[in-house]
Amino acid sequence: MIEFQRLHKSYSVDGRQIVALHPLDLRIGPGEVFGIIGHSGAGKSTLIRLINRLEEPSGGRLLIGDEDVTALDSQGLRALRRRIGMIFQHFNLLSARTVAGNVAFPLELVGTPRAEIDARVAELLARVGLQEQANQYPAQLSGGQKQRVGIARALATGPQILLCDEATSALDPQTTASVLQLLAQINRELGLTIVLITHEMDVIRRVCDRVAVLDAGKLVETGPVTEVFLHPKHVTTRRFVSEAEHLDEAELHRDFAAVGGRIVRLTFLGNGTYEPVLGRIARDTGVDYNILSGRVDRIKDTPYGQLIVALTGGDQTAARAGFVAAGVQVEDLRV
C-alpha cells in the first residue's frame, strides 16, 4: 500500500511560492496498476517523484506499507530505493555500456557477485525479449527496445514498486502498445505495484486498474478506470476522454441539431457489449433509431461499447426501461 496523507510540494522562485502539488490524500493498493493523468504542469512528475523522494515534500506524509517515507534518513532512503524501480520517458541509458551492461549496473552498485549478476541479467533480458541484443549498444536500438532495456534495468534489484514516468510518450502507437502489454504481463506475473503517469487517456484505458486525474496541482477525480472513463465528472477528465475517443463535442452537438427525436448515450459493459440489445428493443417497442456516434473497445480486459443514438417514434419510455433492464446505462443528452 502506498498512501499519501495531505502530501504537498511547493517551490520558492524569486521570493515567490509556487505550488506544484496541493495537499492530497490518495491510496494505491498492492499489486495495482495505478495511473496518474494530467496535462503538462499538472503535477504528475512531482507526484511520482515524491514516492522515491527524488523530490522532497514540503509537508504531509507518505507511507509505503507501515513505513513513513518522509521520515527516512539517508540509509533508510537507500534501502527504500532498492525496492522501487523507475523508468523514464527518454530511457536514460548509459551510451558506453551494452544492453547487458546497462541492466547489470544497479546490481554492480550494491555489490552483487558477478555470477549472480550474469544470471539475473540473462533472466531479465529473456523477460523483456532482448536476449539477442545483449551485446549491442543503445545507439543500435529502436525506441521500443531502449525502453525494454530501461524496464529490465528497473527490475534488476527485484523491486516491489515500479514507477513509470511518461514511459511511452516518446514511442509510436504500435511500440506503445507492445510496451504496455509488457508492463501488464510484469504486473500479472510478478505482482508488482505499478504507478504510471501519462497525458494520454488511451494509455490509462489499456493497462490501469484505477486512475487519478490532476489539474493545476490538484487531485480533481479518482476511481476505477471503467467508472472514470465511462462517466467522467470533472471537466478536465471529460476532455481527456473526448480526446481518447476522438470526439469533437461541438461537432457532435451540430449533428444533434440536424436530427429529430430523443438523443441518448448508451453504455454497454462486459459481455453485454456484444448482445443485439438495440435491435431487439427497437422491434419490441416500435422505436426507430439513428446512430450518431459509436465505439466498441476494451478497458484493460473488459469490453465496453458506447453509442449515441437518436430515438424517434414508438414507446420511448418502454425502450429506455428495456435498456436499463438489459444492464445498459442510459444517459439522456436531449429529451
Curated annotation (Swiss-Prot):
The reaction(s) this protein catalyses: L-methionine(out) + ATP + H2O = L-methionine(in) + ADP + phosphate + H(+); D-methionine(out) + ATP + H2O = D-methionine(in) + ADP + phosphate + H(+)
Record-listed E.C. numbers: 7.4.2.11
UniProt enzyme class: translocase
Pfam families: ABC_tran, NIL
Entry's localization field: Cell inner membrane
InterPro entries registered for this protein in UniProt: AAA+_ATPase, ABC_transporter-like_ATP-bd, ABC_transporter-like_CS, ACT-like_dom_sf, MetN_ABC, MetN_ABC_transporter-like, NIL_domain, P-loop_NTPase
Cell membrane found in the keyword field: yes
Keyword Transport among record annotations: yes
Coiled coil stretches, renumbered: none
Keywords: Amino-acid transport, ATP-binding, Cell inner membrane, Cell membrane, Membrane, Nucleotide-binding, Translocase, Transport
Disulfide bonds: none
Bilayer topology: Peripheral membrane protein
UniProt subunit comment: The complex is composed of two ATP-binding proteins (MetN), two transmembrane proteins (MetI) and a solute-binding protein (MetQ).
Function, as annotated: Part of the ABC transporter complex MetNIQ involved in methionine import. Responsible for energy coupling to the transport system.
PANTHER family assigned: AMINO ACID IMPORT ATP-BINDING PROTEIN, METHIONINE IMPORT ATP-BINDING PROTEIN METN
Protein name, per record: Methionine import ATP-binding protein MetN
Organism: Xanthomonas oryzae pv. oryzae (strain KACC10331 / KXO85)
Source taxonomy: Bacteria, Pseudomonadati, Pseudomonadota, Gammaproteobacteria, Lysobacterales
